[in-house]
Amino acid sequence: MTFATKYGPWALGAGTSDGVGAAFAKGLAEREVNVVLLARRRAVLDQVAAAIVSQASAQTRTLAVDLAEPGAASAIAAATSDLEIGFLVYCAGAYPDFKPFLANPIEAAEAMVQRNCMVPMQLCHHFAPAMVEKGRGGIVIFGSGAGLAGGPNMVAYGSSKAFDMVFAEALWGELHDKGVDVLGLILGKTNTPALRQLEYRRGQISSPDDVPVGAAAVDDVIAEAFENLTNGPTWMVDEDMRAAVQMMA
């Protein structure tokens, strides 16, 4: 069975405007799966779509939705009702701002939980039944090393990523014997535009174009993801992340 037969004909990628999300979408298209590109900024999504179409034969569709807003999952479901979605990858999720929990309004934490917990859960509940019925499909939920243990200045973020990991593990337990691959992909520091901006604001790097110390390359992360789609329920990306987990065990 080809990749496209198992996971196609369409994939939905949430958070695919740049970084690991855009790279994952490109990887899907290279494997002949059509991709719905989803994020807040339509203009950027259109650029990603154009790049994909110029390099692969897959079709694309762009969908601009703010995942922090209530009703986001319903809007996504309505906008993709004419498509057969065989693969869902959820890599949206804001980086922490490294402020104490009490220094931010509660609305900031609520938006984080909406984006990182509620929407992926709702999308899985919507799209997974058709995958189960066909006996094939895939779901990848991006997690973070911040979800492995609580830490200051990442209270809502780390907690939401802990949810993502446990949710993926539990969903794998229910779906893997039904032909649906579920993977919680746990990332460490990754050289994305969002991380570079964050580290630049914190004074950790001198320019937003600098590579943060110890950050994994996006292409390496995506290569590991595709190589381990069937190795759920979780996969720790990068040797440094796996070593850190071993030390915590």
Name these PLM-found stretches.
Residues 10, 15-19:
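Conserved glycine-rich cofactor-binding loop
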Residues 31-47:
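Conserved glycine-rich Rossmann-like NAD(P)H-binding loop of the short-chain dehydrogenase/reductase
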Residues 69, 74, 78, 87, ...:
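Conserved mid-core segment of classical short-chain dehydrogenase/reductases
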Residues 124, 160:
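Active-site helix of classical SDR
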Residues 144:
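Residue(s) in the substrate-gating loop at a strand-loop-helix junction
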Residues 184, 200-248:
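C-terminal helical subdomain
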